[in-house]
Amino acid sequence: MKDKLVMLIILDGYGINPRKEGNAIEAANKPNIDRFMREYPNTIVRTSGMDVGLPDGQMGNSEVGHTNIGAGRIVYQELTRITKSIQDGDFFEKKEFLDAAENCRKHNSKLHLFGLLSDGGVHSHNTHLYGLLEFAKRQNLKDVYVHCFFDGRDVPPDSAMGYVEELENKIREIGVGEIATVMGRYYAMDRDNRWERVKLAYDAMVLGRGNQAQSAKEAVAESYKRQEFDEFVKPTVIMKNGSPVATVGENDSIIFFNFRPDRAREITRAFTEVNFSGFEREKGYFPVFFVCMTQYDKTFENVVVAFKPESLENTFGEYISKKGLRQLRIAETEKYAHVTFFFNGGVEAVYEGEDRILINSPKVATYDLKPEMSAYEVTDKVLECINKKEYDVIILNYANPDMVGHTGVFEAAKAAIEAIDECLGKVVPAVLEQNGVVLITADHGNSEQMIDYETGGPFTAHTTNPVPLIVIGLGDVKLREGRLADLAPTMLDILGFEKPKEMTGESLIVK
């Protein structure tokens, strides 16, 4: 092993909120974190808006956060890229969209637009859907159908009605489109191989099977009566004259307007894989012209990608690998992609000297039922790795403050913070025993605001709050405030390396 171990611990969803009410972090009994904040140099780091390549005022998220941390520069996110493309007009000339329209003309088939209907900006943005409706209008397409996935996580849990109304107004204004199905993201956007959920979403869109309603608004109202809010709205088929408005059929075109890959993959596979094993498709495989807004998975066949990835050279992981350092990435399932794929700038490749450990997330319906998640198992494993003395750098993510924060259950979020505090109480001393340095930070906020300050209802989304950075084991250094892009240069500074020219972030250690 080289001179010292440098460990970055990302407390996912752990923000700083000056307000005490609804603040699960403030309410939690966390003696270790409190002591670290008292005894070691710390500062605040910005995680939202233009600081991470998002539009002003847009909350950060785990994908964006880890990409910025690993890149050591502000990375302009897909959301910003696509919005800019609509504003500049090149969106309407995209070859992939034009080919989808041409496919509809050639086969006299339908165009289906589906994705998350919200302005949360984490997985999608409704303005991109409006851009596609405008595109369809310009292409003179008549049979255009929208399949709405409701959010309730990155926006308030009961806000679907407003998004539906806005969409219906846009459809009237633009003069094209009709809502064919609605459903919660719980079904259409699973990422944990819970294929029984995905099947219900697929069957609604392909077979016209599921709950029925005469309009999207009626579907929402009926669902709320059953106490099933946006995320959990059961796949519902909109009916007209006794039959579904539209179903997806052979040679139809589909544009999936979600830009974040992780929750878009499963439903995409159901539509595009010839030999699909997730569940039995009653109609089997049939060809469709499928456009992914961004690259969901480079191994996917039978899809085209509208906004192809822009490569990031010399991310932190790649750079220290070239320098001959050994690194470990460790997290539980929910955040494993974030400390690997996203941290490496959207690259699947594992670098030389990079090891990865995945600890399974617990199989529970919602994480408020098990707020500790798999933190203890992650901790046991990372302690084992620290004690082996094989690594120069360890990147660890604790998922709890974010995943439990998303449930909106205050007591559970508090318990989640207490669980990770207990874990930090073991991990930090283990690193210090080896004269190592620990950086504790977060990728964005969540658990520090569990209530909506305007309505008093539960708040399940991320926040725009800054996050802490605590530097332990480096003596009494002076730190300045910064943004997530400054973390990789800070770690390189501690490791004694010049940062590569591609990294525009700056070390937060004041010399």
From Swiss-Prot:
Catalytic activity: (2R)-2-phosphoglycerate = (2R)-3-phosphoglycerate
GO MF annotation terms: manganese ion binding; phosphoglycerate mutase activity
EC class (word): isomerase
Cofactor binding description: Binds 2 manganese ions per subunit.
Protein name listed in UniProt: 2,3-bisphosphoglycerate-independent phosphoglycerate mutase
BP GO terms, sorted: glucose catabolic process; glycolytic process
Binding positions (Mn(2+) 1): 402, 406, 462
CDD domains: iPGM
Alphabetical list of Pfam families matching this protein: iPGM_N (PF06415), Metalloenzyme (PF01676)
Active site, per annotation: 62 (phosphoserine intermediate)
Residue sites binding substrate per the record: 123, 153-154, 185, 191, 260-263, 335
Quaternary structure and interacting proteins, as annotated: Monomer.
Annotated EC: 5.4.2.12
Record: residues binding Mn(2+) 2: 12, 62, 443-444
Pathway: Carbohydrate degradation; glycolysis; pyruvate from D-glyceraldehyde 3-phosphate: step 3/5
Cofactor: Mn(2+)
GO terms for cellular component: cytosol
Protein function: Catalyzes the interconversion of 2-phosphoglycerate and 3-phosphoglycerate.
Keywords: Glycolysis, Isomerase, Manganese, Metal-binding
Recorded family membership: Belongs to the BPG-independent phosphoglycerate mutase family.
